[in-house]
């Protein structure tokens, strides 16, 4: 910006005192100070906006790079999965054709889900959770009878003589 030293400021003040006069000089100085402050705030706002735009542009660039990398990884994964699926289908077709020629059974092929359920023994998650003994639940501080907040308040509220309603 403009390089103003003490000697230049003193010269400007002396000229202003002569031209404007001692009566109006304080008012003019306040007005000039307000205008200079407003100009500085405007310049700072412009600088902040420019820096924000630069940051946003950098973030957009990083986002596009990240999206491209994610897309490449996704395509690679899909390609690998399709190759393995194709290899498994070919192996399954080959084993199915050889087993169908040697075995004339009912054609039942067990799925992984039924094998998992028969191996596990229990089908329901709640049954599995209920299989823990009560002494273990007490030791682990597991709640056995969960109660809502309203039910807990009703349970611990002192009994009154008559049943009150909100609308009475």
Swiss-Prot record:
Residues 92-132, 146-168 are annotated as: Disordered. InterPro entries: TatA/B/E (IPR003369), TatB (IPR018448). GO terms for cellular component: TAT protein transport complex. Keywords: Cell inner membrane, Cell membrane, Membrane, Protein transport, Translocation, Transmembrane, Transmembrane helix, Transport. It is found in: Cell inner membrane. Belongs to the TatB family. This is Sec-independent protein translocase protein TatB. The gene is tatB.
